[in-house]
Every structure is written in structure tokens, then in C-alpha cells.
Amino acid sequence: MKTWPAPTAPTPVRATVTVPGSKSQTNRALVLAALAAAQGRGASTISGALRSRDTELMLDALQTLGLRVDGVGSELTVSGRIEPGPGARVDCGLAGTVLRFVPPLAALGSVPVTFDGDQQARGRPIAPLLDALRELGVAVDGTGLPFRVHGNGSLAGGTVAIDASASSQFVSGLLLSAASFTDGLTVQHTGSSLPSAPHIAMTAAMLRQAGVDIDDSTPNRWQVRPGPVAARRWDIEPDLTNAVAFLSAAVVSGGTVRITGWPRVSVQPADHILAILRQLNAVVIHADSSLEVRGPTGYDGFDVDLRAVGELTPSVAALAALASPGSVSRLSGIAHLRGHETDRLAALSTEINRLGGTCRETPDGLVITATPLRPGIWRAYADHRMAMAGAIIGLRVAGVEVDDIAATTKTLPEFPRLWAEMVGPGQGWGYPQPRSGQRARRATGQGSGG
């Protein structure tokens, strides 16, 4: 496999970047559109949808279940019924949202549906969701990929207890389909911790936007009443998690990066993202339709609990590795990342140490002591976030090569182009002002149709 030489920015990066739509919001909107269509409410439109491997897998899954998806690029329409054909088989790839959101949908069908995925996906946690479906009366063969869901045309619902310590997607997957259950659904989380809670809040917010009656006022308990799921137009926000890699470029280079389309009010965990950037002495400026981050001249190590936003861990670990030499950062609340696309804690520790850094695992996180890094290969482990972390390291360390930049197709197929356009031909442009006759670079992922 050909490696990707990560561009280096010997001077501060100055750029405006447009990132495509949110993967998390796109796939939730697609599931809700499918449920609305299956209830006979009509077609829904998704505008600004992300087109990436994860969302293509979701589109394929819905079509496998018998639904119809029309449109090109980022404008999609979902209609039809849940009527899977004989031998229906859903490919989950490495997409956790497909793996955990689609089985409850399949339970509403009337024929068995087999689920499988990439070899690497077979280690991802799924048993608690399958056990919950069994508790609700669904026949399920298997405890992990591959498994088979035997739909019988309806699902009574009721109350289910589930340990979602390994993934908040277990809860979201049940809640998304719950309004179509005869008696609705009450979900009680029984585990000691709940990672990525803002993503459950996103699910609840989008259910309300679809007219679903959901009560999440009691911690670790959610109640969805049976009723209609409205067909509607979904306008997808830019993917703020993907934007963090680009904003990190401003932090590590002392430059300025502006993200277009940053929402004033978001269903994504925007506040958590901005709090981390401010902790690193970055200046965050909101405009009407953008967010600008001005990086510091330097920053020390930091302590941060990433339980709510574990997806940010690879980017934050890269920032920690590039902090002031000798300073120590502690990343906590992320034990669940051992069950993500790869064991992200082990992968980050291995790769930072491979480049001469000092990183060790703890029971629920990482401790990183910033030391000068050297050139070398950064392995991505087929993980999009790991590939992006290698790109961040490469901004400051010449000679870093990412072994599998194509892993970014999972959520951002345009990443290599956007990154190169942001950095420019071998270097960034100075902050606070570009040189005479020059303008800040602009990188956009819109209109690609991905």
C-alpha cells in the first residue's frame, strides 16, 4: 500500500475550510426517514447529506430492507416500505451506526435479515443490543457479526434494560425505531458509565424534530411513546467532529482556520469541542455562519475528560504529543475506545511511541508526555480518526507518512484534498496577515457528491 506523505506547515496555517455534512446526523436522518416512509407518512428529503463509506453503507442497508432512495450527491429522498426480500443481507462494513441502528429496523420487517461486516468489525461490541432485541421478543441468531434478525412484521416494545457502557449507539439504535413499536419503548441504562452521551442527546433532539414524544428527563432512562414519525426535510449540519482535525491545524501551527457553516445552535457536541480548544489557549470567534480559531504561540500539556466526545481522542492525542516539550497531558474517560474501529488507545500509544514520543495507556485513557518527534510511518489501522491524527502530527514533524490515508473515506472522502488545500504547497501562510498580494487559502468539500 502506498503511503501518504503528510504535508508539513513550517509557518502558521491560514485557511478557510468547508467540511461536508455530519455522518452522525445523516445516518440518523436516514433511519428516521425510513421509519416515516414505512408508517405511510410519505417521503423525506435529506439535504446536505454526507456521502462517505459509512453513509453509503446505510443507504445500501435501507435499500436491502426494501426502501427506496433517490437522488444524487448530497440531496436524497427516502420512500417505500420495510419489505426485505428473501436472503436479505446487510453489509455493516466498519460503520457502527449501521451495525447498531439497522437491526431494530429489520425487526419490523417480515423476513430474516443477515448482518455482517468487515473482518475488523467482528470485534466491535453488539451483544447488548442483540440481547435487548431478544428481551423484546425478537428472534436473533448469534451474539456478534455475523448475526441474523428474524422480523415478524411488528414489535411490541415495552421496557428493556441495557448496559450501554461500551457504546451509546445501543441506546440510540433502540430509541430511533421505538415510536414504531406497538407499545413504544422505555430504555434503562444499567452500566456504571455512559460514553458519548451527547450523541444520545442528538438522537433525542432529532426524534423530537420528527414529532416523536420522547422523555429523557431522568438520567440514564429514556421513554418513547408510540406514534407517528413525521416525513420532513432534514438539513444536515457540517460534521463538527471532522472539522476538529482542521481546527487542530490552527492550534499546532499558531495559525488561523475558519470553518464555514458552523451552526450557532447544534445537535452535535459543539460546546465540548470549543471548550477543549480554549483549554489550549486558542481564541475562538463565532461569526454569523462560520467559526474561526486562532492558534496560540504555544501550549502546555492538559488534562481532559473525553467521555462525552470520545471520537475526538485521536486528534486531541495528536495535540498532546505536540505540546510544549516535557509537558504532560492526561486523557481520561475513554476506556470504551478499545472497542471502536480499532483499539484506539493501544493504536495511539503505539504510533506516538513509534515516532519517539512518550505515551502510555491507563485503565480509562492515555498519559502523553510531549517529546520531540521524529519522521516515520504512522499506521492508521483502517481507522479514519487515526489517519487524521497522523496528518496533524505531520504538520509539525517533517517526514511523517500515513500508511492508509484512504481510511478517511469512512467519513470524509475528500480529506487528503482538503488537507492539502488548507496547508498549501509545502507550507502554510503567515498569521495574522497573508503577505502582500496573497489571500488565505480556501478548501471546500461541498459539491463533490462524494
From Swiss-Prot:
3-phosphoshikimate binds at residues 23-24, 28, 167-169, 196, 311, 340. GO terms for cellular component: cytoplasm. The lineage of its organism: Bacteria, Bacillati, Actinomycetota, Actinomycetes, Mycobacteriales. This is 3-phosphoshikimate 1-carboxyvinyltransferase. It comes from Mycobacterium bovis (strain ATCC BAA-935 / AF2122/97). Belongs to the EPSP synthase family. It is an enzyme of class 2 (transferase). Pathway: Metabolic intermediate biosynthesis; chorismate biosynthesis; chorismate from D-erythrose 4-phosphate and phosphoenolpyruvate: step 6/7. GO terms for molecular function: 3-phosphoshikimate 1-carboxyvinyltransferase activity. It is found in: Cytoplasm. GO terms for biological process: amino acid biosynthetic process; aromatic amino acid family biosynthetic process; chorismate biosynthetic process. The active site is at residue 311. SUPFAM superfamilies: EPT/RTPC-like. Residues 426-450 are annotated as: Disordered. Its EC number is 2.5.1.19. It catalyses: 3-phosphoshikimate + phosphoenolpyruvate = 5-O-(1-carboxyvinyl)-3-phosphoshikimate + phosphate. Phosphoenolpyruvate binds at residues 23, 96, 124, 169, 344, 385, 410. The gene is aroA. Monomer. Gene3D superfamilies: Enolpyruvate transferase domain.
